[in-house]
């Protein structure tokens, strides 16, 4: 994964460290200096900040003291509980934090070799489709010899402070981390995809079955190494950081550090009882103000759990900000969950393997409608199709598809007043099985995301077999920015961008001809087909000028619904389009009949019910069956 890591600001960690050791100096980062510019992008600085190296703060600095734990972290003066909550989640996953903090043993202070320390660290973050290696020096902002931002329980443990500094460097300054989104940090730590869940939507509070399904999904993400966060929405500025009677805090991001089904009871009998309780462990980045309801640290409910089970769960009575609660109570009090899924693309895994397609694009403005790529959402029908378009295929009868679009992070532009995200989203349309060019008219909408001014938008949906077009858009037309599209399917989806509006003219066009007409054929279904006692196993083939489109087989019915479309750019208008119906058999497929379609340039999408004919164009009495077809035809190749 990290062989393709890109050096941020072209700073090579190894080369910089070697140069410092050779010159016997401590590294000073020219790209993120120890100055107010690295602290603030606006406003008046507070108390005088002194930048100090760890050995100026304590006698025996360490990256880690007794390993790394979610208990290590405490939020500082900047309002970035979202980042600290993400760090708490990261600390609970060794395989993940060792990717963010590479070669940590080499970066650790070595008391036996003090001359090997050069005051330089580096950390890896996933940013807009690639891993970047961020170099920082070890000068940290302090007031009265105390770290003013993220810090550890132990005064001589420092891993979280330089990680935060590297993340602030990416954002432009520490102040740019104020008021962020936990989902963004979780993605930046893992390269996964974040799925936000609104616990107030639908009837989760009252529907036990839906609640149980969601718990299983949360448990699955946690058990497969994903990261999870939860929060209580603050509806007004006055609500921010308000403490509820139960001890929870509004507008605060909590890290989910464990998810499990807890066995109730004592002794051998407990192993044979089926009673288990769905429970969640969370942590407040402040390290205090914890849950005081049922199953809190000193709650009598813990008497229902055996001592061995409590030890296995790590239940302690400490004011460390970590606490257990039932999943039911979590759904009652919390309003939002963020699941960061680590998408498994390894063929060697025992778990489900996904195929990922990753494409970059952009919303760009242009006066020419055919070159404009910033058309806004579907509300703007005149310009909607002037957006980037991406086509992909679902090759199974039905497949779960994960789709995420991300806009380039903008925190680093806050200094110029440009740090706000665009409102973005996307629609997915089922299109013709042979489409190769951009859409110009509406087709069946298969799914759509919400529109929100967040860095990324995610959708998980089930799609039947076929070809689809994703149209990612900004909410309003005319807005510009870069985008990253990620599509995950069970088998390769052949996802690619549609760039051309119509077939290109080449040097052969004058010899072989150029299309004069575009025709869309939509075969909806059939009725009254010749069948056996179990019904026909039929499919259709649409033929036009040597090109074929075939539907899936519809089994065991004489009234199949094919719902298959083909689009054809036609040169020989006198040749009819043929729709053939076949019966799928073991040895040889059986021809059931066909119809010929003759079109005119002004044909609309009228529904035609046509009787099947034999190959000679006759309609014998022993050839039953009717095919329902819609045809759309135009002399303008960009009409469909």
Curated annotation (Swiss-Prot):
Residues 499-617 form the C2 domain. Keywords: Hydrolase, Protease, Thiol protease. Residues 344-496 are annotated as: Domain III. GO terms for cellular component: cell surface; cytoplasm; synapse. Its EC number is 3.4.22.-. The active site is at 81, 252, 284. PROSITE patterns: C2, CALPAIN_CAT, THIOL_PROTEASE_CYS. GO terms for molecular function: calcium-dependent cysteine-type endopeptidase activity. One of its GO terms (biological process) is proteolysis. It holds the Pfam family Calpain_III. Residues 26-343 form the Calpain catalytic domain. It comes from the Eukaryota. Belongs to the peptidase C2 family. Calcium-regulated non-lysosomal thiol-protease. This is Calpain-5. It comes from Rattus norvegicus.
């Amino acid at each position: 994964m990290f062989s393709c890591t890109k050096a941020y600001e072209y700073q090579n960690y190894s080369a910089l460290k070697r140069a410092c050791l050779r010159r016997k100096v401590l590294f000073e980062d020219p790209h993120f200096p120890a100055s107010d510019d690295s602290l603030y992008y606006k406003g008046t600085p507070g108390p005088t900040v002194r930048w100090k190296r760890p050995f100026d703060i304590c006698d025996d600095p360490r990256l880690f003291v007794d390993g790394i734990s979610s208990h290590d972290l405490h939020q500082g003066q900047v309002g970035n509980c979202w980042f600290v909550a993400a760090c708490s989640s990261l600390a609970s996953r060794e395989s993940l934090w060792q990717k963010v903090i590479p070669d940590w043993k080499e970066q650790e202070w070595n008391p036996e070799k003090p001359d090997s320390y050069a005051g330089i660290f580096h950390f890896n973050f996933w940013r807009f489709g690639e891993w970047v290696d961020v170099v920082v020096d070890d000068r940290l902002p302090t007031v009265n010899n105390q770290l003013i931002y993220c810090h550890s329980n132990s005064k001589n443990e420092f891993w979280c402070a330089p990680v935060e500094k590297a993340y602030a460097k990416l954002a432009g300054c520490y102040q740019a981390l104020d008021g962020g989104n936990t989902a963004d940090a979780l993605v930046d730590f893992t390269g996964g995809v974040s799925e936000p869940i609104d616990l107030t939507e639908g009837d989760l509070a009252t529907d036990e079955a839906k609640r149980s399904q969601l718990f299983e999904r949360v448990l699955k993400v946690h058990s497969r190494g994903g990261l999870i966060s939860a929060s209580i929405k603050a509806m007004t500025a006055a609500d921010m950081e308000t403490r509820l009677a139960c001890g929870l805090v509004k507008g605060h991001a909590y890290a989910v550090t464990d998810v499990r089904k807890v066995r109730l009871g004592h002794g051998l009998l407990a192993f044979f009882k089926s009673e288990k309780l769905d429970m969640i462990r969370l942590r407040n980045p402040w390290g205090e103000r914890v849950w005081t309801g049922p199953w809190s640290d000193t709650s009598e409910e813990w008497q229902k759990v055996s001592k061995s089970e409590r030890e296995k769960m790590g239940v302690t009575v400490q004011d460390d900000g970590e606490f257990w609660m039932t999943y039911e109570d979590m759904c009652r009090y919390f309003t939002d969950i963020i699941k960061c899924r680590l998408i498994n693309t390894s063929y060697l895994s025992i778990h489900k393997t996904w195929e990922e397609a990753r494409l970059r694009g952009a919303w760009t403005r242009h006066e020419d409608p055919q070159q404009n790529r910033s058309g806004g959402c579907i509300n703007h029908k005149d310009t909607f199709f002037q957006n980037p378009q991406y086509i992909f295929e679902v090759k199974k009868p039905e497949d779960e598809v994960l789709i995420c679009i991300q806009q380039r992070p903008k925190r680093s532009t806050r200094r110029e007043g440009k740090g706000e995200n665009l409102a973005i989203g996307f629609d997915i349309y089922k299109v013709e099985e042979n489409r190769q060019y951009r859409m110009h008219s509406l087709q069946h909408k298969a799914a759509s995301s919400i529109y929100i001014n967040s860095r990324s938008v995610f959708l998980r949906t089930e799609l039947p077999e076929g070809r689809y077009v994703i149209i990612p858009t900004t909410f309003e037309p005319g807005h510009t920015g870069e985008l990253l599209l990620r599509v995950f399917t069970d088998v390769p989806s052949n996802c690619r961008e549609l760039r051309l509006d119509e077939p290109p003219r080449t040097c052969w066009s004058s010899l072989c001809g150029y299309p004069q007409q575009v025709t869309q054929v939509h075969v909806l279904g059939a009725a009254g087909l010749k069948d056996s006692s179990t019904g026909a196993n039929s499919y259709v083939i649409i033929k036009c000028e040597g090109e074929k489109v075939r539907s899936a087989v519809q089994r065991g019915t004489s009234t199949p619904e094919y719902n298959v479309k083909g689009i054809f750019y036609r040169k020989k208008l006198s040749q009819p389009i043929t729709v053939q119906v076949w019966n799928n058999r073991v040895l040889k497929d059986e021809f059931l009949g066909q119809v010929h379609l003759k079109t005119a340039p002004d044909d609309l999408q009228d529904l035609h019910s046509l009787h099947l004919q034999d190959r000679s164009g006759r309609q014998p009495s022993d050839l039953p069956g009717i095919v329902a077809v819609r045809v759309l035809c135009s002399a303008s190749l960009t009409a469909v």
